[in-house]
């Protein structure tokens, strides 16, 4: 059995004499191990059908019917209702005959008689999603695409009727059936899941029921198998690839699907991929972004909210083409649309798609122009990982214990009282920084999970859990409190959000923030103003904000833009 924890964690638990380490994960929200079945509400055409599908799932679980027979039986019923086979299962068209001969399965009468709704766009895909456990979907990355997203991505292609279209992760065939004005023999689908392939074949025959054709749906590993597909060149490749489901690999599998799909595009061919928003800015995907902007034309990036049951990741759709790179691409967020510069992507440290407006770019350019120093020469420390918060943290102080702060107690400039206490014994802790970092006479601490930097000052030598990290800054000409003033400034929050777009405040990003050269008088002034905020326990100073805006020559209109962005 594959271990559920990393080897490093295993070593730490062994060091700490933790027993039944694998079982620790059963008390946590470990989706990869979940056997819970979740009804994907966003996949329904009519939410009134949810109780019907819930009843069906209970029936299937009680009877313990095999998935393949369940789905085959439901598909047979749909073919009957569409008039493509009769009540004796005799096919009326050769594609239905081919499908029935391919799958030597016996229909289940109880499923043939079940009162399925007749107004669902993809009933078979919906049944499959309802039957699969949360853990299965999480491990494979297989969450089927809601119809409203399918329609939006498939719409507007405008290719010829005989354009070759491929979905390399076709699932139930939702994207392919969206091209109902195309020749179905020119629509190709691939999936590694044989049940998904069977569903897609049923769905293709049902959608194009007035045409007699054999669905071009195939079961193989698109990334590793060498088949006739590799010899074809497609006018459109459209898909929702698995996110993070590449077994035994460090990279997300969608990266591999993207790279191979671009190789299979015809000259001028289009590509439309649904991707996690991490594609836009996470450092590990820098190589992929660089590959795209240097070799292909980015047409549009559309931003969606999280919309898959069981998935909290926001996502985007990428529209690109096999053409020379252009200077800009279109950004679509809700009803708003605006052009964004490819140059800004190329100029960023990690080649991120910041989806910047021209106003965003102008502000970032002003900040970069004044950069004289950064935080790269500073000292950094991680918060403590106890390995067992439940037993090692205390809710009240007791002899020998001391306060330990979390990210929740960090406010701009100051800390609220600690709510947890710890007996500090480094040998019994899973992760610690050096003592001299925790016990430094002065240090800054910041929230690890946040959409913008939030820093506080500590001069008590306090301990911090790993929801907070530590910075002892070294910026020439600046006191630690002056640095704190810059880090909590609206301008720096804006720079971080637009330059990195991450919900984690990472050292690698913070080290790139642009600090200016200042006079000793400026340092004294800012140090005193920040000290006043700390002592009075205030989180905001208009004096500091305006001073830093003036320092970077940020206009009143740009200040308003920054403040609206941060709201």
What feature does the model see in each segment?
Residues 133, 194, 223, 243-244, ...:
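Short, solvent-exposed loop/turn segments at secondary-structure junctions
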Residues 164, 188, 236, 443-444:
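Structural motif
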Residues 2-31:
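Intrinsically disordered, low-structural-confidence terminal and linker regions
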Residues 557-567:
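Short, amphipathic C-terminal "tail helix"
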Residues 265, 362-525, 550:
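Polybasic, glycine- and aromatic-enriched phosphate-binding surface used to engage nucleic acids
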Residues 215:
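Short, conserved active-site loop motifs that form the nucleotide-linked donor/cofactor pocket
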Residues 23-24, 28-206, 226, 281, ...:
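Class I S-adenosyl-L-methionine
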Residues 1-9, 148-149, 170-177, 184, ...:
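Signature of N6-adenine DNA methyltransferases within the class I
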């Amino acid at each position: 059995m594959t271990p559920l924890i990393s080897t490093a964690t295993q070593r730490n638990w062994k060091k700490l004499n933790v027993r039944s380490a694998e079982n620790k994960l059963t008390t946590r929200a470990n989706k990869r191990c979940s056997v819970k079945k979740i009804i994907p509400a966003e996949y329904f055409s009519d939410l009134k059908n949810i109780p019907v599908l819930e009843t069906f799932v209970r029936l299937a679980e009680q009877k313990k019917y095999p998935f393949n027979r369940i789905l085959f039986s439901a598909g047979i019923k749909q073919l009957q209702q569409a008039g493509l086979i009769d009540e004796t299962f005799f096919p009326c068209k050769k594609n239905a005959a081919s499908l029935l001969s391919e799958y030597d399965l016996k229909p289940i009468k109880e499923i043939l008689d079940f009162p399925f709704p007749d107004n669902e766009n993809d009933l078979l895909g919906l049944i499959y999603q309802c039957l699969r456990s949360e853990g299965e979907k999480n491990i494979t990355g297989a969450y089927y695409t809601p119809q409203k997203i399918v329609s939006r991505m498939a719409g507007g292609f405008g290719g010829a009727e005989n354009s070759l279209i491929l979905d390399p992760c076709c699932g139930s065939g939702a994207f392919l059936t969206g091209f109902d004005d195309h020749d179905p023999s020119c629509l190709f689908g691939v999936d590694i899941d044989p049940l998904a392939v069977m569903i897609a074949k049923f769905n293709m025959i049902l959608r194009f029921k007035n045409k007699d054709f054999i669905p071009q749906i195939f079961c193989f590993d698109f990334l590793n198998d060498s088949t006739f597909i590799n010899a074809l060149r497609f006018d459109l490749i459209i898909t929702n690839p698995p996110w993070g489901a590449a077994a035994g690999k460090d990279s997300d599998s969608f990266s591999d699907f993207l790279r191979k799909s671009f190789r299979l595009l015809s000259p001028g061919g289009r590509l439309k991929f649904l991707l996690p928003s991490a594609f836009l800015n996470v450092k590990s995907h820098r190589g992929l972004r660089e590959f795209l902007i240097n070799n292909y034309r980015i047409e549009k990036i559309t931003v969606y909210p999280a919309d898959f049951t069981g998935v909290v990741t926001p996502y985007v759709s990428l529209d690109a083409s096999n053409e020379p790179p252009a200077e800009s691409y279109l950004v679509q967020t809700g009803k708003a649309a605006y052009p964004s510069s490819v140059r800004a992507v190329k100029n960023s440290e990690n080649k991120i798609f910041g989806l910047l407006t021209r106003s965003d770019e102008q502000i970032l350019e002003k900040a970069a122009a004044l950069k004289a120093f950064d935080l790269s020469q500073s000292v950094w420390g991680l918060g403590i990982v106890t390995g067992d918060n439940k037993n090692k943290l205390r809710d009240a102080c007791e002899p020998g214990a001391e306060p330990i702060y979390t990210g929740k107690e960090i406010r701009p400039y100051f800390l609220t009282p600690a709510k947890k206490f710890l007996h500090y014994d480094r040998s019994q802790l899973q992760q610690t920084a050096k003592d001299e970092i925790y016990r430094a006479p002065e240090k800054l601490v910041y929230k690890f999970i946040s959409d913008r930097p939030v820093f506080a000052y500590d001069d008590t030598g306090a301990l911090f859990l790993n929801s907070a990290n530590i910075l002892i800054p070294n910026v020439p000409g600046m006191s630690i409190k002056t640095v704190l003033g810059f880090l909590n400034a609206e301008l720096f929050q804006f720079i971080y959000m637009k330059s990195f777009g991450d919900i984690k405040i990472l050292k690698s990003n913070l080290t790139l923030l642009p600090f200016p050269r200042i006079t000793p008088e400026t340092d004294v002034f800012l140090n005193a103003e920040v000290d006043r905020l700390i002592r009075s326990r205030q989180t905001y100073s208009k004096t500091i904000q305006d001073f830093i805006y003036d320092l970077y020559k940020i206009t009143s209109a740009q200040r308003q833009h920054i403040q609206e962005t941060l709201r």
